[in-house]
């Protein structure tokens, strides 16, 4: 959809950095596309984004203002919706410079439905098809700010991770340091396979998949990167274990893996296992990028969860892949 011109100057830069918005200015922009029938209210406010609920006749729309760390999300979402309108939330408007996004309502998050594996079985083949088609757009996505976490970049990113102050015990950091040469070998091994790197959602869980009748849509692309596609299921499988309480050896994991891999071709089970192992570390590296954009006052709360992500990676320094 066409965007208004970029007329906003210093205030725009401040808002985009923080994800906060001036409500009056925001309402003017929203009203150019929809007619609210009640108060526009904040649904949530985070350092990286603010989401507003916009009531309209017959339903609701959603406004999102992204901070700088996720500033690529509105354009990426609009591009994905243009090419995959049945799989991504309908984009009513976006403003690339202000990092603003206006979405139609997409239904109910599947977490409210219990995060059933049957829903993932229906979703994952379509998600794989989206990734396959988006591989042709990698250059464009990178040029417009989607983070580059391609496999060849990961060893150097791993080294950068080790140079940072991490919310871990010294012996845990030592384990990560000792694993660095092996991690580089795993990346080389994974990079040798002929699987195209593409958009990887990296937050593909029950709160970001919505159901509206039989229609399933993926939302919240702000954690995406260009990376190995198979690593998308790192987060999906984690939530199926932790929330749905599937055991690691539950047959559902193989069923979901096979459903996801079917569009990619045969004989990729070993590549998938390797990508999942490497992907756990890539996910931790991506979290570091988010952390770097937080104000100091918000880092302690963030680190309480970041430490869990890091420890899941540490477990892979000795554990074989699934």
Can you name each region flagged by the protein language model?
Residues 6-40:
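Juxta-kinase regulatory segment immediately upstream of eukaryotic protein kinase catalytic domains
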Residues 7, 18, 247-248, 265-267, ...:
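ATP/Mg2+ or Mg2+-diphosphate-binding catalytic cores
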Residues 41-57, 62-63, 91, 184-233:
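Active-site acidic catalytic loop and adjacent metal/ATP-binding pocket
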Residues 43-44, 48-148:
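ATP-binding pocket architecture of kinase catalytic cores
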Residues 102-116, 132-136, 159-167, 277-299:
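A glycine-centered beta->alpha junction motif in the catalytic cores
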Residues 114-175, 195-197, 225-226, 300-304:
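A cross-family kinase active-site recognition segment
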Residues 144-149, 265-278:
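All-alpha amphipathic helical-bundle segments outside canonical DNA-binding/catalytic cores
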Residues 216, 229-265, 277-296:
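Active-site activation/catalytic loop segments of kinase-like enzymes and analogous catalytic loops
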């Amino acid at each position: 959809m066409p965007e208004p011109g970029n007329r906003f100057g210093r205030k725009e830069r401040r808002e985009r950095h923080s994800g906060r918005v001036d409500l009056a200015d925001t309402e003017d922009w929203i009203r150019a596309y929809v007619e609210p029938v009640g108060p526009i209210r904040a649904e949530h406010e985070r350092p990286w984004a603010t989401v507003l609920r916009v009531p309209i006749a017959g339903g609701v729309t959603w406004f999102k203002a992204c901070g700088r760390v996720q500033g690529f999300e509105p354009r990426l979402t609009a591009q994905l919706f243009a090419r995959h309108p049945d799989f991504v939330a309908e984009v009513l408007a976006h403003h690339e410079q202000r990092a603003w996004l206006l979405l139609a309502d997409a239904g109910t998050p599947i977490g409210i439905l219990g995060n059933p594996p049957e829903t993932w079985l229906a979703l994952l083949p379509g998600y794989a098809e989206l990734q396959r088609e988006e591989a042709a757009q990698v250059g464009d996505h990178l040029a417009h700010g989607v983070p580059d976490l391609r496999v060849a970049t990961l060893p150097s990113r791993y080294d950068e991770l080790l140079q940072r102050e991490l919310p871990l015990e010294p012996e845990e950091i030592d384990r990560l340091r000792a694993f660095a040469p092996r991690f580089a070998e795993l990346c080389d091994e994974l990079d040798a396979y002929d699987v195209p790197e593409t958009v990887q959602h990296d937050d593909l869980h029950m709160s970001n998949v919505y159901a509206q009748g039989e229609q399933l849509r993926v939302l919240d692309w702000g954690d995406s990167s260009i990376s190995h596609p198979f690593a998308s299921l790192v987060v999906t499988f984690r939530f199926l274990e932790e929330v749905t309480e599937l055991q690691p050896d539950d047959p559902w994991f193989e069923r979901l893996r096979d459903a996801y891999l079917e569009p990619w071709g045969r004989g990729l089970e070993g590549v998938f296992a390797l990508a999942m192992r490497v992907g756990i570390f890539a996910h931790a590296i991506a979290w570091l990028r988010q952390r770097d954009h937080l104000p100091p006052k918000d880092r302690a709360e963030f680190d309480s969860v970041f430490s869990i992500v890091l420890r899941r990676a540490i477990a892979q320094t000795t554990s074989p892949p699934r």
